[in-house]
Amino acid sequence: MGKITFYEDRGFQGRHYECSTDHSNLQPYFSRCNSVRVDSGCWMLYEQPNFTGCQYFLRRGDYPDYQQWMGFSDSVRSCRLIPHSSSHRIRIYEREDYRGQMVEITDDCPHLQDRFHFSDFHSFHVMEGYWVLYEMPNYRGRQYLLRPGEYRRYHDWGAMNARVGSLRRIMDFY
């Protein structure tokens, strides 16, 4: 069970809303989000309703302003609690529709291009666990939640291009 609290103002001030489950539309509860406290669980925040727009991965901790979670603005319109997973396995492919070279990963990878020498990553098959895909190396840039399932092309995980720099397992030890 997870618990997250959204605050309208920085520094955990102003109107707040406590949440313990997925919400496809947070707009009725607050107009802006400038700070967040994650008491338990791992969460993906979305800039738009229905789990769309920019995504931000948060684990247990305090985030006194939106820049602390690499947010571009104070807009948080939906959230998803990420289930705990004890094992992680993902296959990454050089081309769309699982074509080209394939590599299977079971651990975090801060620099995919250096490790595997692919110039692009066009499809993924998440066999086990939940992962965060980052646009740039060293877990920077836009973030995308990968749940168990198939991602045949970059549009399937919500990206505008096939730029992938790093990949991290979602693990909650708290």
Swiss-Prot record:
Gene designation per UniProt: Cryge
Q: Which GO terms describe its biological process?
A: lens development in camera-type eye; visual perception
Say what the protein does.
Crystallins are the dominant structural components of the vertebrate eye lens.
Q: Name one GO molecular function term.
A: structural constituent of eye lens
**Name of the protein in question:** Gamma-crystallin E
Miscellaneous information on this protein: There are six different gamma crystallins identified in rat lens.
Q: Which organism is it from?
A: Rattus norvegicus
Q: What is known of its domains?
A: Has a two-domain beta-structure, folded into four very similar Greek key motifs.
For this UniProt record, the keywords arranged alphabetically read as follows: Eye lens protein, Repeat
